[in-house]
Amino acid sequence: MHQSLTQQRSSDMSLPDSMGAFNRRKRNSIYVTVTLLIVSVLILTVGLAATTRTQNVTVGGYYPGVILGFGSFLGIIGSNLIENKRQMLVASIVFISFGVIAAFCCAIVDGVFAARHIDLKPLYANRCHYVPKTSQKEAEEVISSSTKNSPSTRVMRNLTQAAREVNCPHLSREFCTPRIRGNTCFCCDLYNCGNRVEITGGYYEYIDVSSCQDIIHLYHLLWSATILNIVGLFLGIITAAVLGGFKDMNPTLPAMNCSVENTHPTVSYYAHPQVTSYNTYYHSPPHLPPYSAYDFQHSSVFPSSPPSGLSDEPQSASPSPSYMWSSSAPPRYSPPYYPPFEKPPPYSP
């Protein structure tokens, strides 16, 4: 009895613990997936802003934001399901795994490009000039009017007044004449007279920008995308691990409560006394006197006669009023005392 009570108490204590562990895992899964979804939205926003900032620089890493965002969305849905929870979480883990790989690659590409191919020194020194978009006729007028001035002044006027062809001074040569499109930020210090092998500062022109300040914004956006991709990389790994540990857990409190309630009526210390009293009621010959009530009747009801007479002539005795049962006498064969398959004891004189 003591052992059964101990087992019952331990099971009752383990049920809230298991349900608490399930709720804790579910809460942690929702927290990490929501956090990953927020980081994915930031990666997508910053990556698209960096990609669309210029026309010729499209290295913003927004692809991991799409993949990680979809995987985290599936994780949020799967964490709130019960029947199809495992399938949804497995799909979420697969997408998050691909998003982690994409975040790693994009972090390297964006970081290397921002560090190696964008030089902000000419921009901070105001040596880069913005060429607005004008018509071809205006550009020809600017070029023709600039021939009357000195070469250095002509270069500056061509750069500031959006000429299609400008002259950039060079150490080994007198001038270089590159062709510049409209809405372009051009840096002569980074343009080595068209020799792409000898370019020392990376990109020398940034097409389709509103001003040269957009290049500084692009630089900051690329580094922001790099940092966010690194954060998404580690957060995706943590999210996949948390979802992997939660996908096989199920709430077991209702089923265990039913089993505990069903086992209470079958406990030994409740059922044993009932069975014992039932058995003692129907099987109690040892607790009764050796003779039944039939043997304790008066001699007027049962006259004394030798047992041999009863055994010799059992059929010769005719019924008479003196041998009839009285109204207060119990029945001759009482089922509670003698079952049908047992023979009653012999009658005593």
Swiss-Prot record:
It is found in: Membrane. Keywords: Membrane, Transmembrane, Transmembrane helix. Residues 316-329 have a biased composition (Low complexity). InterPro entries: TMEM255 (IPR028014). Signal peptide: none annotated. Its main location: membrane. It comes from the Eukaryota. This is Transmembrane protein 255A. It comes from Macaca fascicularis.
